[in-house]
Amino acid sequence: MDLENNNNTPLTGKQAEKCAKKRKCVITLDEKQVESKRLKKEESNVEATSRPPAQSPKKRLHLNGKPMQNKDLNFKYGNYKHYYGKRILNKDFHDIRLDVLGTQPDLFRNKQLLDIGCNSGHLSIQIARKFEVKSLVGLDIDRGLINDAQKTVSHLKRHATPGQGIPHIQFVHGNYVLEDDVLLEIERPQFDVILCLSVTKWIHLNFCDSGLKQAFRRMYLQLRPGGKLILEPQSFDGYKRRKKLSEQIRDNYNAIKFRPDHFTEYLLSPEVGFAEMKLMGIPEHCKVGFKRPIQIFTKS
């Protein structure tokens, strides 16, 4: 049959060829659209059958054994921004650990202190002011928390009333665990008291047994004769809840042999050198706090 145009007149050869190409193009486009819809439907069915079931946030972090990006990974050192803030949002909140530390105020008065893992500095500042220390250095691995602590100190100094003494408080960003044990050889005594409150778990999970043992030895070396290490270790039960923060932390957790109930024996051993340990007290916290023993280790 001859091809005709809209006026039912026969088409010329070129016109017929052009029309045929146009029809072929339209048919091809229609076929592609149909094929595209079919593929999308198949993909949708595959996705529906392969999608994992609903899971808790903790389980979603490790689908197929691989850690997913999660905001908790930013806090793998325990550097929670509101670690103390959650406890002081209520102005009536009182950190009961201050009462335990206050049973021996002479340990702090006119002394030079180091607070390892000071977070945003709330407790450090309260200790410095309440017990009239000579100076206090707060150290934390999170630069943002240190910036917050420095701002708090600056605010206190600006708003201090005449005659209101503000102790010399300095906050420093850094990792207390050294890159190499050989650096311990250059340590010199410079503090009367070192505070390590609820920090051992995070050192342990990130730097293994060797990192925590090195930190203990460094604490001893930085204390003057007769100096005190005030230690508030976390129990090993609390480690398990954080082991999924990253694959490295999980591997470190599985490799731990040096348990918290071994800390005292190690600190009193010749490898470290502390002369004695005494229990300072166990805080009786409200439910938003902690109830961990606070120990005092004395350097002979």
Swiss-Prot record:
Name this polypeptide is given: U6 snRNA methylphosphate capping enzyme Amus
Keywords for the protein's UniProt record, in alphabetical order: Methyltransferase, Nucleus, S-adenosyl-L-methionine, Transferase
Main location group: nucleus
UniProt key word Nucleus: yes
Protein's GO biological process: snRNA methylation; snRNA modification
Family the entry assigns: Belongs to the methyltransferase superfamily.
Phenotype of gene-disrupted mutants: Embryonic or larval lethal. Conditional knockdown in ovary leads to female sterility, possibly caused by dysregulation of miRNAs and mRNAsso.
Function: Probable S-adenosyl-L-methionine-dependent methyltransferase that binds and stabilizes U6 snRNA, probably by adding a methylphosphate cap at its 5'-end. Required for U6 stability, but not stability of 7SK snRNAs, other miRNAs or tRNAs. U6 stabilization is required for efficient pre-mRNA splicing. Essential for organismal and germline development.
InterPro entries: Bin3-like (IPR039772), Bin3_C (IPR010675), BIN3_SAM-bd_dom (IPR024160), SAM-dependent_MTases_sf (IPR029063)
Entry's localization field: Nucleus
Organism in which the protein naturally occurs: Drosophila melanogaster
Group of enzyme by EC: transferase
CDD domains documented for this protein: AdoMet_MTases (cd02440)
GO molecular function: O-methyltransferase activity; RNA methyltransferase activity; snRNA binding; U6 snRNA binding
Biased composition (Polar residues): 1-12
Biased amino acid composition, Basic and acidic residues: 34-44
Region Disordered, annotated ranges: 1-21, 34-68
Outcome recorded upon mutating T298K: In strain: ZBMEL84, ZBMEL95, ZBMEL131 and ZBMEL157
Bin3-type SAM domain span: 95-300
Annotated effect of mutating Y83F: Unable to rescue early lethality phenotype of mutant flies
EC number: 2.1.1.-
Transmembrane segments: none
Gene Ontology CC terms: nucleus
